[in-house]
Amino acid sequence: MKGVNMEKQQPSKAALLSIIPGLGQIYNKQKAKGFIFLGVTIVFVLYFLALATPELSNLITLGDKPGRDNSLFMLIRGAFHLIFVIVYVLFYFSNIKDAHTIAKRINNGIPVPRTLKDMIKGIYENGFPYLLIIPSYVAMTFAIIFPVIVTLMIAFTNYDFQHLPPNKLLDWVGLTNFTNIWSLSTFRSAFGSVLSWTIIWALAASTLQIVIGIFTAIIANQPFIKGKRIFGVIFLLPWAVPAFITILTFSNMFNDSVGAINTQVLPILAKFLPFLDGALIPWKTDPTWTKIALIMMQGWLGFPYIYVLTLGILQSIPNDLYEAAYIDGANAWQKFRNITFPMILAVAAPTLISQYTFNFNNFSIMYLFNGGGPGSVGGGAGSTDILISWIYRLTTGTSPQYSMAAAVTLIISIIVISISMIAFKKLHAFDMEDV
């Protein structure tokens, strides 16, 4: 890398010249970088005029002739080209910042790459890790960000069973879908019912599986327990069997009339609990009992993962801490509260939080166990539907409401992201320095 002469550069002038990308770099005597930036801009301008402009125009209008114009395809293609425009805008402002920063570095006597060879060498030495993650960012852009943008756009259209392209055109309707959730009594009632059950479900089911997982791990880690490997295998069985098989099996077991729970388990329990004698619990025909069954099932399905995670953490806690606590006269509860649980929380907090976010969107158990039933709460939602399964109903019913489903999807995303970020911040989930 070549040194830099002491000629002073003007950072503001370099930034101003970079209004045309590349000129600021050329001013800083980085001609190779400048011509590359200028070339990227020329290619983008040609692409924008030839390809992006027509598609972005179609994105705004969503077509004007039914049958010929497919509004949905126009929206998707427009979103695709919009990503490239956004990427270039980020590049454009980065180019201005780069010119300003390099000019300041030159004035401070810091060497900067001038030739193409120096640039390649600098990238290899300092930027090689970033080159390796570029494919991941590209994949993430089109596998995650692109669908999110399309969903966001659909939420602001009237895409439903009455407006199905290409026979009908879509129109931009602004916030109508979001306001309809609150203004239309059917959707307002359904949304309130589904949201409240979703929150109860996520909190109850996740907490249950975490408590069972931590409890079984602590018991299995006790020195007086014999046959730990056998217990380990038994505790892992719910994890080893595919979840959909377990859910379908439980669905049969909880059948009101012929299920094993009512016909075999309850008669055995009735010997110890007389009030259960002759009882037939309506597991799949009463919404309350269905919800209880769902929570118990998720506790069974989810605890093995927490068990394995917690057991690994417990085995890594130094015995010196427990010995010191014993000398200080601490009992078992004090050891757990002041040593065990803080260590588990410090290491596993991100994973524990993810259990709540996962169950908030746990579609499979709702769909496979009882199809969101029994009964309905209006708006196309079943009595045990959570938000994600309600979205499924909105998009696959006889009168699909795609735009409304997209609006609910965005609401889910906002709720989950907000709660997760608050939880991560409050628990200092990624602050591992003190562990």
Curated annotation (Swiss-Prot):
Membrane-topology descriptor: Multi-pass membrane protein
Compartment(s) where it occurs, according to its Swiss-Prot or TrEMBL record: Cell membrane
Main localization (coarse): membrane
Transmembrane feature ranges: 34-54, 73-93, 130-150, 199-219, 230-250, 263-283, 294-314, 338-358, 371-391, 404-424
GO BP: maltodextrin transmembrane transport
PROSITE patterns for the chain: ABC_TM1
Pfam families the record matches: BPD_transp_1
Domain of life according to the entry: Bacteria
Molecular functions (GO terms): ABC-type maltose transporter activity
Domain (ABC transmembrane type-1): residue spans on this chain: 195-423
Key words, A-Z: Cell membrane, Membrane, Sugar transport, Transmembrane, Transmembrane helix, Transport
GO cellular component: maltose transport complex
Family of the protein in this entry: Belongs to the binding-protein-dependent transport system permease family. MalFG subfamily.
Its biological purpose: Part of the binding-protein-dependent transport system for maltodextrin; probably responsible for the translocation of the substrate across the membrane.
Name of this chain's protein: Maltodextrin transport system permease protein MalC
